[in-house]
Structures are given as structure tokens and as C-alpha cells.
Amino acid sequence: MENHQKTSFTFEIENFSERKYLIWSPIFISGQCHWFVKVYPIKDNNYDHVSVYLHVANPQSLRPGWKRRAHFSLILSNQSGKEVKIPSDSCDLFCTELSSSYPKILPPIKLKEEGFLENDKLIITVEVKVVEVVHPGELTGKEMVEFKELQDLYNGVQQNKEVVKNCELMNMDMKQDSLKSNHHEVSLKDKKRDDADESRFQKLEERLKNLELMELDCLKSKLEEVSIKNKKADADRSRVQRLEERLKNLELMDLDCLKSKLELVSIKNKKADADRSRIQRLEERVKKLELMELDDLKSKLEEVSLERKKSDDAYRSRVYQLEECFKNLELMVLDFKVELDKKKDKSCDDGFLLVDEFA
């Protein structure tokens, strides 16, 4: 005996009221065993219920003699968080002959009334606790007795099935005898109808043959057209293949050409980068020279401006002196003129006096 931890698995069924057939859940693992759940909604006039079964997954892949015991309980819930648990009072046995549990019965009316079909969705949580797992070669004496009793029960069920099958076969034989007698009577009546219908059938067969011949001719012509179209399509496909090959060759040639051009461009770019670096260096040198020349020119200009200022000052002073001399000369000339005029006036007066004396 070994107890495993309880495992829960939840799955949702959408549009539950519209489901009419068996619903399988995904496979899940509990107690190192693979399981799945079957939900079977049965709806008829006499009985309406939902059966939920726990199944062992892929029992045919297990070795003979396997056996498992597990507790199986259900929890129903809705989207609003309401829950109800359907516990398990017994421990179910799973083996080769019984790979599923006893069903849990759920009435759909109660599911609707208690609000477990909210938005027509049924949410089922399966709780499985594996109590015992027996592999082949691990059976004890007590377990062998239980297994043999279970196998005898299974064999008895199989024998009862064979008895039921034999009874069904006897009933079928009796039904066949009655059917044969009825068939003989019906066959006499049908023979007359068959004789009358035979001529009609022959005529219909002839018309059908004519139609078939016409259809065959039509089909042959269509087949020839289709074959011609297929030949054209094959020719077009071959042309397309040749064009694709040529295109690939051209693309390869273009790639080679582009690669060579790219190499040339890269070389040119490298040269251009080298030239640009040289130009930058030259520009820097020219800037330095220009700055040096500007400084030299500024110093020379300052010297020239100082010399010119000195010469201008000397020139101005000389001009000022000349202007003063010129003014003095003008004053002297004016004084000289005044004295000359005075002398002229005086000489005139003296002349008049002489004239008066001589007169």
C-alpha cells in the first residue's frame, strides 16, 4: 500500500446544453499515473442525467497484471465562485478488466437551478488520490486472490454475454423463418410487377446506354481538350523552368558584377577617405599659416599706422607752421600796402603844394 498526494484537475465545457455526445477531458497525471475524465450527457424522454467517469489513460499500453486503487471526487463551480463538492465514499479499483470508475450522476435540472451552468458553461474539478499502484510482478497472495476473483467475475460476465448472444441468434432465426414465408407471398405479387416493369427497364437501359455513349463521346472530347491544355501547361512549366534558370544565372552574374563594383567602390571610398584626411591636414596647415600671416600683417599694419600717424603729425605741424607764416606774410603785405597807400597820398599832397607854389 502506498498513498500519493491528492491531485486536482479542472476543465471547462462551453455550450453544455447543446452537447449531446461524449465529452473527453485532456489527460492529466495523478500519483504517477495518467488519467482522463469522460462526461456523458444522456437526454431522452425517460431519463435525463449527466454521468462522469474517471478513466485510466491508454490502458492497452500497460503490461498485463496492472492494478490501481484511487479515491475519485468532483467539485462543481461557476464563474461567480460558487462551489459544491461531490465526495467519494469508496475507493475505486482500476485494472485491465475495469479501466473506468463507477459514474458520478449529476442531474442537469439541479445544475441549472443551483447556478452551475452560468453562461452555459460547466466547470468540473476532479480530485484524485491514488491509494495503490501495483505493477506486474508485484502482486501479493491476497492481491492474487482478489485479482482471480475479479477475473472470474469478468469471465462470468463474458459468458452471460455469450448466452444473451445465443438467445438473440435464436430469435433472429425465428424471425428469418417468418420473413421467408412472407417473402414468398410477396415475391409472387412482385413477379407480376417485375414482368410488367421488365420491358420498361429494357427501354430505360437502352436510353441509358445511348446517354452513356453520348456522355463518353463528350468526355473523350473534353479529355482531349484537357490533355491539350495539360501539354500546353507542361510546355509552359518547362519554359518557366528555363526562364527561372536563366534568371538565376542572370542574378548570379549580377551578383558577381555587383560584388566587383562594390569592391571598386570600396577602394574608391578608401582613396576618398585618404584624400579627405590629407585635405583635412592641408586645411589645418593652411589655417595655421593664415593665422600666422594674419598676426604678421596685424603687427606690420600697426607699425605702418604708427609711422603714418607720426608722419601725419609732423605734416600737420609743418602745415600749421606754413599757415602761420602765410598769415604773417599776408599781414605784412597788408601793412606794406597800407604804408604804400599812405605814401602815395602823401606824395599827392606834396605835388599839389608845389603846383600852388609855382602858380
Curated annotation (Swiss-Prot):
Coiled coil is among the record's keywords: yes
Give the coiled coil ranges: 146-337
SUPFAM superfamilies assigned to the protein according to its UniProt record, in alphabetical order: TRAF domain-like
Pinpoint the MATH domain residues: 6-128
Q: Which PANTHER family match?
A: MATH DOMAIN-CONTAINING PROTEIN (PTHR46236:SF12), TRAF-LIKE SUPERFAMILY PROTEIN (PTHR46236)
Kindly state which keywords UniProt assigns to this record, in alphabetical order.
Answer: Coiled coil
From which organism does this entry originate?
A: Arabidopsis thaliana
Q: Which PROSITE patterns match?
A: MATH (PS50144)
This protein's name: MATH domain and coiled-coil domain-containing protein At2g42475
One family name in Pfam for this protein = MATH_2
Name the InterPro entries on file: MATH-CC_domain_protein (IPR050804), MATH/TRAF_dom (IPR002083), TRAF-like (IPR008974)
